[in-house]
A protein has these predicted regions:
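Short, charge-rich amphipathic alpha-helical segments embedded
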Residues: 3, 19-51
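TPR-repeat structural position
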Residues: 15-16
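Alpha-helical linker/edge segments of TPR/alpha-solenoid repeat scaffolds
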Residues: 43-65
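Eukaryotic intrinsically disordered, low-complexity regions
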Residues: 83-113
Length: 113
């Protein structure tokens, strides 16, 4: 569900705040469901939401993915909100926060039955 606060940020065309809220949703909901919903909403209203990929290094060695790498990538996302970085970060978050995401999915399943 997209919050009223997020909708207000998008309506105000506040790119920085919108990007920060999107970034934060990676950690709040590591299933990425919230991020995907928020991104869909924002990209439909903010044509300048995405930037070009800056070409900076992306850690592709899965064995090195940990919270430190994830946090570095989250910080970089705010200033380089590119589709390339988002796609990479989705993979990193899915791996690093795999346990947390599983707990959330289980809870959602239990609540829906």
């Amino acid at each position: 569900m997209v919050s009223q606060e997020f909708k207000a940020s998008v309506a105000d065309k506040n790119l920085l705040r919108t990007r920060i809220m999107l970034k934060d949703s990676f950690v709040v909901d590591p299933t990425l469901a919230q991020f995907d919903e928020m991104l869909s909403y924002a990209s439909g209203h903010l044509p300048d939401l995405f930037t070009q990929f800056d070409g900076e290094y992306l850690e592709n060695d899965i064995s090195k993915w940990n919270r430190d790498v994830m946090n570095e990538e989250l910080v970089r996302l705010v200033t380089n909100f590119s589709k390339t970085r988002i796609d990479h970060l989705k993979k990193v978050v899915s791996k690093v926060l795999e346990t947390e995401a599983a707990k959330i999915r289980k809870k959602r399943t239990e609540q829906s039955t």
